A protein has these predicted regions:
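Acidic/glycine-enriched connector segments
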Residues: 2-99, 103-106, 110-118
């Protein structure tokens, strides 16, 4: 991923997985608590899900980004790998994303498609 900063929510299994993956490819990796998340200081929101299901906390955060007209992308890890990867690349390029908040449910960690998708980005 060609972004300057990846922002993750603190203390979640999903964030820990993304943090491990991003450690080698991102210079600036931040983990913030919910109360320290400032939507105005983040360029965009990347949501990982499976089968288009969004948890309540993810939906609330999405609503905040919508309110400020920030770019949002959903990646369904059970979808086609090539389509998801190319959509992500185009989204980052088109929206000039520099800082991206990446969120997803903790149960995604158990889905083998998450690891497969992340490995395809390296």
């Amino acid at each position: 991923m060609q972004v300057d900063r990846i922002i993750l929510k603190l203390n979640s299994k999903f964030s820990n997985t993304i943090s491990t993956w991003a450690a080698g490819s991102c210079n600036d990796l931040m983990q913030l608590s919910d109360r320290n998340l400032d939507v105005m200081s983040i360029d965009s929101l990347l949501i990982f899900n499976q089968n288009q299901v969004l948890k309540q906390d993810v939906q609330e955060l999405r609503t905040q980004f919508d309110k400020y007209q920030k770019p949002i992308l959903h990646i369904d890890i059970n979808g086609t790998l090539a389509v998801g990867k190319s959509n992500l690349d185009l989204w980052i390029e088109r929206n000039k994303c520099r800082s991206v908040l990446i969120i997803g449910a903790d149960d995604l960690v158990d889905n083998v498609n998450l690891e497969r998708f992340l490995n395809s980005l390296n």
